[in-house]
């Protein structure tokens, strides 16, 4: 009998014995007498842990450990380790009577259930895609929650028996609130923080005068003071054209009763919205905002609405980021530290051993108690107190505000509001006059904002509300009573705060404590309002206590902030790049490396791009007065990163467009000066030494000319042309072999990212002995991609710093990487200077046989001049290298892009033929093809500053230029000037080579002109040799570019999250095999 048969027989025998055992057991049972139907009562037997362990092996124990570890830490499970399947095996392997097996199965079922929302909280469809005007539909299943026109919620159950005869509201004001003397805020918080608070308050609370239980605004942070509380109000603020709002308008009338600074902040959000929708339409991500003909009414209405609604989501997203990253961080005094921590309710949470994750996107309904929490009149500055007193004199001429009866006060407010026009553009604002386009003059708005930043707010506490607010506070007390709310102590207990046992605990000032005692008799009877604003204020603590508000308020506002944000679907589960677009989502995100994640500057610089420097302290930290910010940032060691100058208008540069005018300006070094010196010095300054000032492009002085002469001699050696040509042919082919691949049998490569950009990186590293990590130099520091990014950032910071909203971030990043690269390069140069042995060793690490005259040899030639190594590196090598890589790469990519276009592709067969000829004549024609492609796709613009008054003729017009005026020589338009280039849209190979403008002109013409022409023509030759060269299908085969000012191209990153001055990606395809690399 075989082993298999024996096993089968034994198994059968075991089964038979088990059956016999069951029969015997059944025969020994007593008759069933416990049931009426004659059946036995059975008990489910549960096996114990010892019996279960007999079914568990080491693999099962490992499964339990892995699952427990994930539950404890929240760490994701690696499904490639088959943990789910192992759990199933373990559960299935335990006896059916196993209690552990049952618990394990139930846990598994619970996990699977909890994987999905029940019910779902995010939905598809246009109805759920955007915020509704009245806030309804935030919770799709309970759409009324938080909608405008619904009742306030009640948070705290009022159980305390209170006297029906409570103290007179005006007496309460006089006893507890009236300002005796002004006290500045202890942390020197500016009034801007309280203007943001005013917007938040009026975003969430607007009590219906006819029914005080109703709030006329939504319960969400949706910027309703700007956009309106309902569809009718929202329609009044919209232009219904291209998704835009009416310029410099806001919906609410109530803000006009506040100092104009509040309205200015709303106008800034208005401008940000209009900026966003312009960019959304321009980028048109995935064809989402393709503009139809306006005659197609329905299609255009959809286009306009999609832009408007998406722009609103984005603007509200920035608004909430300002609240969480600027406002709340300042409230908690984290702005005084170098921490990037923030109390962000959008944090991703998962259930764990310590409890369930907080729910999100549930909706929100504001509570009446919180309507009272945010009444912060004690913090009104002396400046704003004066403004309010002046306004009262307009409303109630000759009357003392403290003596106005409540009835007269309400009638006066009613008359004032009734006079305000319904049309937002017609309402008076701060005495300003609108311009023809409906906007206000930037100078006026900036002046108001600037003064707001410098205006220190008042302190929290009793006896600090200006008397002009007597009637308003009395109305607030009456309103609170009409809501029948809980007492101060009940409100504190709700937040698990100890109730006050004595009046001195409420306020340690003997006078205030005594007044409370006379008014309320017992601490338990003190009303929530004014109780919460007469408590002692917290002391400053960094981090922890920055607002220094009353004790109960400091706790309540944090709970409210979490509820408002985490409960809002559009700020949580639907706050995604898919809803906002990749660019817009990235545009409003905080950066860890900028301002410790503060984002207010994003609003300021988009609203007033011509008044603030990119590093202005007024833009970056406006919630604290500048003088206090100076102390804070000096202590943190970052004060020198910012400009402390007051905002000042800088006119946009004058564009010069004709070829003749551009060439004339670029040739006139006396009248027109270069502007890059301060940028170069900023990046190159090292160990407090002002390096970079004498670099060739830093100025128009003699040392700058000498720098150009020195670097020119170093670059253009004997046989340079032969060496450069051989290098580029070799490296281009090598990169093609390394980075190309086949998709379904078709050759493909990203010709921009992996060929054009990296070829320049390799050349630059070889020429200047930079620490590039490659297969032949594994001990290098930077990868090809990293070194390209460094060089691109440096070049952008110096020559393309045109986006004021990104300027600070760009320049700080550029300085950081420049310093890092510079120190490594300096160490290398100093080694070469000290010893020939090490120099030879370094040379072997960086050597490229083709470039025998460069690398270590070139560094040695520079050292032979007697110049110190730091001066060589920081003033000459780094700026030259930084100006080379990205510029050369973009010129090649732009030229190739033209020849891959529909109009340019007719030339590809001839380029292919010439590339294969490999003759001097063919190479000369390829150079002309390259120059024409680069001319047609040029995106070069060169700035100059006018040194002395002059007149320039540009396209037949006389332009008067003033001293100090900034101009832009637009080489895009100059390169397409039909006077210089007849039929400019066509490729002509007989044009005068001296007229091409894309390398600049005059004494600051690109030093690498000759080198570039040779290098990039060689690259065109290698790529052009590929058969049936063509774009990859779809968007991947095209450069994503938009037309900026003056027609200058703006490119985008591959994921379209940001603009970039250079091409970033474009994939090409071809037929046949690549030629072998000739070593």
From Swiss-Prot:
Homotetramer. This is Psi-producing oxygenase A. One of its GO terms (molecular function) is monooxygenase activity. The active site is at 374. Keywords: Dioxygenase, Heme, Iron, Isomerase, Metal-binding, Multifunctional enzyme, Oxidoreductase, Peroxidase, Virulence. InterPro entries: Cyt_P450, Cyt_P450_CS, Cyt_P450_sf, Haem_peroxidase_animal, Haem_peroxidase_sf, Haem_peroxidase_sf_animal, Oxylipin_biosynth_metab, Ppo-like_N. It comes from Aspergillus fumigatus (strain ATCC MYA-4609 / CBS 101355 / FGSC A1100 / Af293) (Neosartorya fumigata). Belongs to the peroxidase family. The gene is ppoA. Residues 654-1079 are annotated as: 9,12-octadecadienoate 8-hydroperoxide 8R-isomerase. Heme b binds at residues 202, 377. The keyword Nucleotide-binding does not apply. Residues 105-446 are annotated as: Linoleate 8R-lipoxygenase. Its cofactor is heme b.
